[in-house]
Amino acid sequence: MSNQHTLLISNLLPVGSNISTWWNFGSMLLICLTLQIMTGFFLAIHYTANINLAFSSVVHITRDVPYGWIMQNLHTIGASMFFICIYTHIARGLYYGLYLNKSVWLSGTTLLITLMATAFFGYVLPWGQMSFWAATVITNLLTAIPYLGTTITTWLWGGFSINDPTLTRFFALHFIIPFAIISLSSIHIILLHNKGSNNPLGTNSDIDKIPFHPYHSYKDTLTSTFMLITLFIILSFTPDLFNDPENFSKANPLITPQHIKPEWYFLFAYGILRSIPNKLGGTLALLMSVIILTTMPFTHTSYVRSMTFRPLAQTMFWMLIATFITITWTASKPVEPPFIIISQTTSIFYFSFFIMNPLLGWTENKIMMNY
């Protein structure tokens, strides 16, 4: 009996031997989450959720609190790193057909939506000029909901405009939701290891598995170290790389910025929102830009799981990546030609991937059957 237990421990979490570096982003995300919760806790100690004091409290943290500037910048840059890792993680899932493990994919999509909500609440907290106006624009989209829109918006704001109650509840939500993210992440990991990881070939790994530790754990440590080195280089040399210049001014409801935009990691969804002139249509497109990921397990038609051996699907995938980057770029620009037409065109390309992918799978099946 003891020999069986020893064998179990030494072979704890068997993993396919051929999984590549793209499989390391899960552990990198775990490190990002830990970093965000730790720095967030120390920032919350000194932060004041009041519209008259919030901006000053952030300045106080940066200037007066010992190592406060490190905590504040780590939290800001860490959020960007988090989204870089999660978008890469999702892209890997799309490329290698990991969405066919439905429970893992759907729990991951839920995690993404929760993360985006948390990041949005956090962006409002410094109460800078861009924080205030981005919050006003995004929360105002709720008024597009027929019949209930205005009531829901007033309830969320805690009044008839964004004010002190709004900031207080956004701070409360930004503090509490990360604990829900920890729970969802645990569920995501449990569901994944219930069936086991896929591999770049999209084949069954049961005949060729090795223990996660020490083989893959060292591989994870390497990429995580590179990520942390990059994080600290940005922190040391260009700490304001991801910040908006407008956000260094205190929120002023009487002055509207020339160009309102959220953080860079929301720009793809914001670009899709802006490309549609109708408010309700834009809001639905914004929601669908993320929710459409949930359709992937149900629209896979190809006999082959991974895109490794699907050249047509690969072309569509890299078009999606190029589209994602282009939408992000256009959304950071003012609403004027040629950015309007570029944004509208790329939005069509973005959604067309989710329509074309099953059609391509069906076409590839036909080609394979003929040979």
From Swiss-Prot:
* InterPro entries assigned: Cyt_b/b6_C (IPR005798), Cyt_b/b6_C_sf (IPR036150), Cyt_b/b6_N (IPR005797), Cytb/b6-like_sf (IPR027387), Cytochrome_b (IPR030689), Cytochrome_b_C_euk/bac (IPR048260), Cytochrome_b_N_euk/bac (IPR048259), Di-haem_cyt_TM (IPR016174)
Amino-acid positions noted as binding heme b b562 in the UniProt annotation, renumbered to this chain: H75, H174
Q: Name one Pfam family in it.
A: Cytochrome_B
The UniProt keyword set, sorted, is:
Electron transport, Heme, Iron, Membrane, Metal-binding, Mitochondrion, Mitochondrion inner membrane, Respiratory chain, Transmembrane, Transmembrane helix, Transport, Ubiquinone
> Quick one: which residues bind heme b b566?
H89, H188
Gene Ontology annotations for the cellular component aspect, listed alphabetically: mitochondrial inner membrane; respiratory chain complex III
Record's cofactor remark = Binds 2 heme b groups non-covalently.
- Give the location in the cell: Mitochondrion inner membrane
Output the Gene Ontology terms for molecular function.
Answer: metal ion binding; ubiquinol-cytochrome-c reductase activity
**What GO biological process, any one, is recorded here?**
mitochondrial electron transport, ubiquinol to cytochrome c
| Record-linked Gene3D superfamilies | Cytochrome Bc1 Complex, Chain C
The way this protein sits in the membrane is described as:
Multi-pass membrane protein
Residues that, per the record, bind a ubiquinone: H193
The entry sums up its family as follows: Belongs to the cytochrome b family.
- Binding partners and assembly: The cytochrome bc1 complex contains 3 respiratory subunits (MT-CYB, CYC1 and UQCRFS1), 2 core proteins (UQCRC1 and UQCRC2) and probably 6 low-molecular weight proteins.
The protein depicted here goes by the name: Cytochrome b
